Each structure stands twice: as structure tokens, then as C-alpha cells.
A protein has these predicted regions:
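Conserved PLP-binding active-site segment of the aspartate aminotransferase-like
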Residues: 1, 282, 358-364, 381-419
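N-terminal basic, amphipathic alpha-helical segments
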Residues: 1-89, 295-301, 331, 335, ...
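Conserved core segment of the aminotransferase class I/II
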Residues: 84, 257-327
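Conserved core of the PLP fold type I
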Residues: 91-231, 243-258, 418-424
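Residue-level detector of anion-binding/catalytic polar loops
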Residues: 153, 174, 234, 346, ...
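Hydrophobic residues in well-ordered beta-strands that form the structural core
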Residues: 156, 177, 235-237, 309, ...
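Conserved glycine-rich beta-strand-loop-beta hairpin in the small C-terminal domain of fold type I
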Residues: 327-337, 347-360
Length: 425
């Protein structure tokens, strides 16, 4: 793809093999360009700045690391694997023939389940307002490609989802970060940004946000909708962690009933990341356009995947699984939070729900450098720079509580903290 080629060229520029010239292209670096070309005998280069795209690629490629406290998924034994296997067996034994394409909107039975679930949370939609996608990432991509034009100012959570930042920049948007707080948004900062810019959209994750796991209060949701109305921007609510929330609470979409809000959800976090089943709910005219764009860009999504997902969420044990998962996550939050506090970490928020804790330590000022060292010890951390709209050195780290209970992780952190204290002295 174009994105892959550009990414490869950017990596070669960062490594010193190519130079990029505005409005001209990429060229092989000559010896006269910025001193000596890379290679044997060349002087040592400065350490390049943290490369978030490269790090993201490593997260998914490097499966051999034994510890993954920085990852964005659950351990396989926390998921509903038995139900997935049952659904697959059922589909293979007496399911319909699946040698053709699926429906443009996606499997009708699953869309009806989604619509019923949203109705339980006070969002009135029918199945024709639901579009199934290959995970929430495709949903975000479709919405961005339909609604974002080159040069648009687009607001995002800061820190937030790095793939979204890349996606929006690739669409030509000017990406502006809105600082998160434990109760939602830094509203004075948001109002200052609205006075300085004319954003067309705000992509946000009010509930159990990654990486902070913060939860926007109802008051913040109402204020955000008021500001969207006053300043004329749309809202995209990425609510992929909703099933991990033990408290029934309103979403932006339920308060707005899809007037200004586009709602995105996913089953990948709680069933299996490999199933890649997400969805978009939107007003009917916009959803019809998203269906057309989905067909243009990749035809239908996998009906096999959607039928397997349907079998799982209609399994009689599905709700019990979610309840057990929430309890397990709450217990992990308490245990990991205690360990971090005992080591002297500062916690941004203590939600006791969702997957993450966002933490920093005064003696570990550079989480990117720490993450490089951790990789050598077989540990995949979640450095804060990865999630910032404008990457810069930071001590913040994202800890996935379901992967953060290995004693080797804590020994590594203790050693690095002690080393940091010795350097400071």
C-alpha cells in the first residue's frame, strides 16, 4: 500500500540512507549530504528520536517476548475462547454455505444484536443504522476518509490512540490534542483550542480511555455536546471498552441520539482480537455513505467472522463471561496499582475497570529509553511517547493490568529505579 511504501521510505530517511526533498521525492543520500554517509567507518550518529510507527509494528511482530505489560489486548485465557470454538463447530457442522460474499452492511443477525444492545443503553437505532467492520480500526478509517478533508483541524484525545493520529495525518488533517484529565477533558484548554482553531471533528474515547483509562463524567459529556453545537464540529465516540465497564452510564451517542455523534464499538477486546469484528452506528444518510465507502475500499467484511461473533454473543454464558472479566480486571487493577504505588509511581487515575493504568516514576524520566532497555530483557512496555499527539520525552507508561503481574517485570522496574536514583545522586 501507499502507506507501507511511505513508511519504508521514512525509515530509510531516519537511518540516513535517503534524503527527502519537498515537492521532489526521496533520493539516495550522497556522501556530501550532511557529512558522511552511513556505513563502516562513519562517525556514530545521534540516537534517532522515538519512532512510534516502528514501535507499533514491533508490538505486533515480536511475539516471542515473554512479557507484554504494554500491549493492548487480553491474555488468551481471559477471553471467551470456548465459546469461539463452539461457534466455529456449529457453523462448520450445520451452518449455511459461506463460499460467497457477505452483505454490504454485514451479517443482519449480528447487526440486530448490536442494535438491541445499544437500545439497552438508551441509544435508539435499528439494524439499518449499524455497519459491521473489520474491527474498530476500519470503522475509524472509514469515518475519517468520509468526513476529514485535507487541511481540516481535527481534535483528538491527548494522550490517545496512535494509529488514529497516523490515520488522520495520512488523510491530510491538522491533528490537535485535547488534554485528558481523570474526569474527562481539560475543558479550559479545550475552549482555548476552539477559540484558536475551527475544528471539523473531535475523535474521542470518553469511557475507559486508552492509555489513561480515565472516564469522562456526565457533566463533561454534556459540556462537550454543548461546545460541539456552538462551534459546529462533529463527534466520533470510540467506545470499544464499553463491555468492560461494570457501571451503566450514558454515552455521548445516547445523550445526542446520533445527531452530531458517530458511535464506534468492537467485540475484539472481549472475544478475540483475531476475529476483527467492529461496528459503526450513525444517522442513516451518513451510514449509507460509509457502506458505499466500505464497498469501494474493500468490498464486504467477512461473514464467517461475523457469524462466529454472533454465535459467541448469543451464547447463554456471554453475560456471565463479561461479569467475570470485569471482576478479574478490577482485581488486577487493585493488585498492579498497589505494586506501582509501593515502588513510588504516580498513578494518573485509579479506575478499577478497563485494561490500563497510566503511571510515571520520578526516577524514570524517559519511558522510550526505558522501553528499549526492557525489550532487551524480554519485556514489551508501553512508552508514553507512543500515545502523545506531539511525541516528546515523557516518563508516562501504559500498563496493561492483565499482563503486569510477572515478578520479572517488577524486578526490572526496581533495578531501573535504583539505577536512576544512583545517577541522580
Amino acid at each position: 500500500s501507499v502507506f507501507t511504501v511511505v513508511e519504508a521510505y521514512d525509515r530509510l530517511v531516519a537511518q540516513g540512507w535517503l534524503v527527502s526533498r519537498a515537492n521532489a521525492g526521496f533520493f539516495v543520500k550522497r556522501r556530501g549530504d550532511e557529512g558522511v554517509a552511513p556505513g563502516a567507518g562513519a562517525p556514530a550518529r545521534p540516537v534517532p528520536r522515538f519512532d512510534a510507527r516502528w514501535y507499533l509494528k514491533q508490538i505486533f511482530e515480536n511475539r516471542n517476548l515473554p512479557m507484554k505489560p504494554g500491549c493492548g489486548w487480553l491474555p488468551h485465557d481471559w477471553l471467551f475462547g470456548d465459546a469461539v470454538k463452539r461457534s466455529m463447530r456449529q457453523l462448520s457442522s450445520d451452518g449455511p454455505e459461506l463460499d460467497g460474499y457477505g452483505l454490504p452492511h454485514g451479517h443482519m443477525a449480528l447487526r440486530m444484536v448490536v442494535a438491541e444492545s445499544l437500545a439497552e443503553h438508551h441509544l435508539a437505532v435499528d439494524a439499518e443504522q449499524v455497519l459491521l467492520t473489520q474491527g474498530s480500526s476500519q470503522a475509524l478509517d472509514l469515518v475519517a476518509r468520509r468526513l476529514v478533508k485535507p487541511g481540516d483541524v481535527v481534535l483528538v484525545d491527548d494522550p490517545g490512540y496512535p494509529n488514529l493520529h497516523f490515520m488522520l495525518r495520512f488523510a491530510g488533517a491538522q491533528v490537535v490534542g485535547v488534554p485528558r484529565t481523570p474526569t474527562g477533558y481539560d475543558l479550559p484548554a479545550l475552549e482555548a483550542l476552539l477559540a484558536a482553531h475551527r475544528p471539523t471533528m473531535f475523535f474521542t474515547q470518553p469511557r475507559l480511555q486508552s492509555p489513561t483509562c480515565s472516564m469522562a463524567s456526565v457533566a463533561h459529556l454534556h459540556r462537550l455536546l454543548q461546545l460541539a453545537e456552538q462551534h459546529g464540529f462533529a463527534l466520533v465516540e470510540n467506545d470499544i471498552y464499553a463491555d468492560m465497564d461494570s457501571t451503566v452510564r450514558p454515552s455521548l451517542a445516547s445523550l445526542d441520539q446520533l445527531s452530531r455523534v458517530v458511535y464506534i464499538g468492537s467485540f475484539s477486546k472481549t472475544i478475540s482480537p483475531n476475529l476483527r469484528t467492529g461496528y459503526v452506528a450513525a444517522r442513516r444518510d451518513l451510514l449509507d455513505e460509509l457502506v458505499q465507502l466500505k464497498m469501494i475500499s474493500g468490498l464486504t467484511s467477512s461473514e464467517i467472522t461475523e457469524r462466529i461473533t454472533f454465535g459467541v454473543v448469543t451464547d447463554g454464558r456471554w453475560r456471565k463471561h463479561l461479569k467475570s472479566l470485569r471482576e478479574r480486571l478490577a482485581e488486577a487493577h487493585r493488585a498492579v496499582g498497589r505494586r506501582l504505588l509501593n515502588l513510588g509511581f504516580e498513578l494518573f487515575h485509579e479506575p478499577e475497570a478497563g485494561m490500563y493504568l497510566w503511571a510515571r516514576h520520578p526516577d524514570l524520566p524517559d519511558s522510550a529509553e526505558l522501553s528499549k532497555e526492557a525489550t532487551g530483557a524480554g519485556i514489551m512496555l508501553g512508552p508514553g511517547q507512543l500515545f502523545l499527539v506531539e511525541p516528546r520525552p515523557t516518563g508516562w507508561l501504559r500498563f496493561n493490568v492483565s499482563f503486569s503481574q510477572d515478578e520479572r517485570l517488577w524486578r526490572f522496574l526496581e533495578q531501573r529505579i535504583l539505577l536512576g536514583q544512583q545517577v541522580a545522586e
